[in-house]
Amino acid sequence: MSGDGGGLRIVRLANFVTPTSGGLRTALDRLGRGYREAGHEPVLVVPGDTASDVRAEQGRVVTIPGPVLPGTGGYRVLADRRRVRHLLDDLAPDRIEVSDRTTLRWTGEWARRARVPSVMVSHETADGVLRTWGVPPALAARAADRLNRRTAWAFARIVCTTEWAEREFVRIGARNVVRAPLGVDLERCRPGRRSAVLRARHAGGERVLLLLCSRLSVEKRPGTALDALAELRDAGVEAALVIAGDGPLKGALERRARERGLPVRFLGHVADREALADLQAAADVCLAPGPAETFGLSALEALACGTPVVVSASSALPEVVGAAGAVAVDTPGAFASAVRALLAAPETTRRRAARARAEVFTWERSVTAFLRAHDALPAAEARRPEPEEVRR
């Protein structure tokens, strides 16, 4: 036991984390805080432009210089294996938790040699990401299966946040897969934040305010939101769209909206989490068009704020939003129709349903599930079954 007070030192390694990244950064922060509160010693290792070693609410955060991955809009990776290996040797972890199955898969082999139990967290589906980049489905599935077999062999356990994310591992017969849903801050994200003044400011005189909270990159399909807005307006729905997020497609999307005369406001990355929650509460409907999402924290945050969400039928989000949202196939027309279907219900009804669904997903339950995957729970708590409503 390396941590203070008999807890475990859980070293977490993650790529694709920047000051402006969204769901993964939030999940790492909240899980780290939860591990600390449970008496463990979390250490997060991430890439950055300069080296640093700081203490934060989520525990110790070590930044190792890493190169920017071209075409990702600033994402960096832990490419210096020698330096990472030496850091792992120095930290002498009791557990490792890895949030990247590509360039960090080798750490599973390090853990096996060091006799350290290891967990890989699947934050995306390999075949889903490949398909969003234009790889034919059959070829994407074969490539994903090869990658996932190596991943399942390399790590003691694979953690998936939804049943949907598990499927590609079930397909290859992996038996070391466990499920651990993510959570949402139900105090920060709440319906009471809804402001008519803020809504009117962003709606700009339109009757319906749509919101997209997303990284503006290919795999997130942000263009679907613009096209759905155009479909709605062509059908006589007076709607406006606000986009909170940044990424490599931002310039192209701005030009597209301008050329088509669409009422779209691009806010860029909203760093203030309180301001983002205000925005999520002010919207009438949020859009989540990414077809490869394995959980969708921004969609869950919108639900917690009382705002229903239209999600891609190709993603895990139908499993997350349940009856509190609407599911659409990956076409602008389908997303527009789903928006109209949600708006047809009384506002009070749809907002209560959204909040009720979000209340199923607490960070306390998430932390417990992740610690269970690490065999890091007290014996009595480890035997406690997962709540049925989370498993569904």
What spans do the regions from the language model cover?
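Short hydrophobic beta-strand element within catalytic cores of glycosyltransferases
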Residues: 308-311
